[in-house]
């Protein structure tokens, strides 16, 4: 009777295991390569969109001091991160200072932002103002705090900008925020009013910019996860149920899933306005309109059916072209 070939069997098992491990490593490598490729695409897309928005609206000029409002959320972290990267390659010189308004919310981790900003070497200022107590005292239980909180915060940030000598105030609102604001004003305010990428502040002393205006929120979520920003949750507004803005956010997310391109077209429509085909008499002189006997390209022909967008278009509002603030091939 032959003895069992224990050594040969063990060797065969070891070979099979080694082969399986190698296959697993190759599969992991391919997956990692794909993830790295997608991450790089995401980064380049956000950089391109931010650079394009800055160029389209002349948000940042040579010699500017940009006050980046940093809340500790994903949007403001991403805005600061991208602006720092753009500044490295920009053909102009501008300074960046990060500002956080500590509103004295219970449990707010005061150490997170100073540690992060010190680590990445960005000048910063922490403004301590107990707006939390004011909001809680003045707003009835169950009512939204957003309106009062934003007014208080806005006034403080305008003052701080003046004290720091900032020429631009950068806020982290993105594409979805802008469309949400449009829908809110239409549904609840009876206005065609959105959230502009650039505006003069209420006091007339500051210019507010929104560099993330062209960026989708889902991209910012992925980017924040990729960069591992130390996110700080907001206890004032994010935890409140039944907010109208939350309803608009859910609606936009649903449209993005079911009807690709719909939200993009709504966003692009904000930069393709035809006042003669609306109803605002302050924008178009309807009362004095008379037949001139000359053909008008914006007349009846405007009611003809136009080709619908496919949803694949990636152009910015108004068909604007990217600016040359950064050489994207070098990223």
Curated annotation (Swiss-Prot):
Gene Ontology cellular-component annotations: cytoplasm
Keyword Ribonucleoprotein: no
Entry EC number(s): 2.8.1.-
Binding-site residues for [4Fe-4S] cluster, renumbered to this chain: 146, 149, 237
Gene Ontology molecular function: any one: ATP binding
Subunit organization: Homodimer.
Role, per record: Catalyzes the ATP-dependent 2-thiolation of cytidine in position 32 of tRNA, to form 2-thiocytidine (s(2)C32). The sulfur atoms are provided by the cysteine/cysteine desulfurase (IscS) system.
Protein name per UniProt: tRNA-cytidine(32) 2-sulfurtransferase
């Amino acid at each position: 009777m032959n003895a069992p070939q224990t050594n040969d069997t063990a060797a065969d098992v070891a070979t099979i295991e080694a082969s399986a491990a190698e296959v697993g490593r190759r599969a992991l490598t391919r997956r990692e390569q794909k993830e790295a490729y997608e991450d790089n695409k995401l980064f380049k897309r956000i950089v391109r969109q931010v650079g394009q928005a800055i160029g389209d609206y002349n948000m940042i000029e040579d010699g500017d001091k940009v006050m980046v409002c940093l809340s500790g959320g994903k949007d403001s972290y991403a805005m600061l991160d991208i602006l720092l990267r753009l500044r490295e390659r920009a053909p102009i010189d501008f300074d960046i200072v990060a500002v956080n308004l500590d509103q004295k919310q219970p449990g707010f981790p005061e150490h997170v932002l100073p540690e992060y900003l010190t680590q990445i070497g960005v000048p910063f200022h922490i403004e301590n103002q107990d707006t939390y107590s004011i909001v809680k005292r003045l707003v009835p239980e169950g009512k939204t705090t957003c309106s009062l909180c934003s007014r208080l915060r806005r006034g403080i940030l305008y003052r701080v900008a003046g004290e720091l000598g900032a020429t631009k105030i950068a806020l982290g609102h993105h594409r979805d925020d802008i469309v949400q604001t449009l829908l809110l004003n239409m549904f609840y305010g009876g206005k065609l009013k959105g959230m502009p990428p650039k505006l003069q502040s209420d006091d007339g002393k500051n210019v507010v910019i929104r560099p993330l205006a062209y960026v989708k929120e889902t991209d910012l979520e992925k980017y924040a996860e990729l960069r591992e920003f130390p996110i700080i949750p907001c206890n004032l507004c994010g935890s409140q149920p039944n907010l109208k803005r939350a309803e608009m956010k859910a609606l936009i997310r649903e449209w993005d899933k079911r009807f690709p391109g719909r939200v993009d077209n709504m966003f692009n429509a904000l930069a393709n306005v035809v006042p003669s085909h609306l109803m605002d008499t302050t924008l178009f002189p309807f009362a004095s309109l008379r037949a001139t006997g000359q053909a008008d390209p914006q007349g009846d022909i405007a009611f003809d059916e136009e080709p619908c967008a496919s949803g694949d278009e990636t152009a910015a509002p108004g068909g604007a072209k990217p600016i040359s603030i950064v050489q994207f091939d070098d990223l």
